[in-house]
C-alpha cells in the first residue's frame, strides 16, 4: 500500500474514532438529561411543559413573537380563544 493510501486510511480511522467517541458522549449527555427530567417529574413538575419552556428559551425573541402571533391568529380563526381575550 502506498504512503498516500496509508495516510488516507489513518485519517479515515481517526475521523471514525472521533465520531464514535462523540456519539458515546452524546448518549451519556442524553442519559443525564433524561435523569434530570425524571428528577423534575418526581418533584411534581410537568416534563412536557419543561421541554416547551426549554424550546421557547432557545428561540430568538422575534421568532418567538412571530410564532405566538401566528398561533393566536389560528386559535382565533378556530374560535378557540377564551372569551376574555376576545373582548380585549
UniProtKB/Swiss-Prot annotation:
<dbReference type="InterPro" id="IPR046367">
    <property type="entry name" value="GapR-like_DNA-bd"/>
</dbReference>
<dbReference type="InterPro" id="IPR018753">
    <property type="entry name" value="GapR-like"/>
</dbReference>
<protein>
    <recommendedName>
        <fullName>UPF0335 protein NGR_c28390</fullName>
    </recommendedName>
</protein>
<comment type="similarity">
    <text>Belongs to the UPF0335 family.</text>
</comment>
<dbReference type="Pfam" id="PF10073">
    <property type="entry name" value="GapR_DNA-bd"/>
</dbReference>
<dbReference type="GO" id="GO:0003677">
    <property type="term" value="F:DNA binding"/>
</dbReference>
